[in-house]
Amino acid sequence: GGGCSPGMRRFFDPRHYRAVLFDQRGCGRSTPNASVENNTTWDLVADIERIREALGIERWIVFGGSWGACLALLYAQAHPERVTRLVLRGVFTMTRAELDWFYGGGAGAFWPEQWQAFSQMVPAEERHDLIAAYHRRLFGADAAERVRFARAWAGWESALAVLDPGESRGSPASGYALAFARLENH
């Protein structure tokens, strides 16, 4: 949900690879920002194929991390004749077990302070389903509440992206957090 950053180029040696980085619908520089309209997994897979066609690439190596790894797998299944290799890192396939671990407290055992900050945003009677509780607020009518919950969601995700629980990436900017959280929660 965060879009591409210049640091993502570090995975590719430009002397050997033509790297194509793109922001999926609603993320990064993609417009409309933070939109979930016409933004299904299969819309994203179709977008990848349109990018390949537009660039005139016959076959390519497909690389993806986290949610991008899931999209890469689905793209390779839909278009096996276009994929020479898959390179996947930090694979997240959005299974019930993965979602329960990330948003049901499992990961919180490793990052207890960050988990408390994330989960305590929601009233106790709604904590049995944090994804749904956050969804109501991320897509609700109150703009200030949307931003507050988006920053909490992005902060939790950021905590999970580092090896040292004491390491902090700081508080994400509101616009980034809103797009990131809405797309991930969607």
Regions found by a protein language model. Give the residues of each.
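Alpha/beta-hydrolase fold catalytic core
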Residues: 150-186
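Conserved acidic catalytic loop of the alpha/beta-hydrolase fold
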Residues: 42-61, 78
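Conserved alpha/beta-hydrolase "nucleophile elbow" surrounding the catalytic nucleophile
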Residues: 60, 64-69
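Conserved alpha/beta-hydrolase
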Residues: 12-32
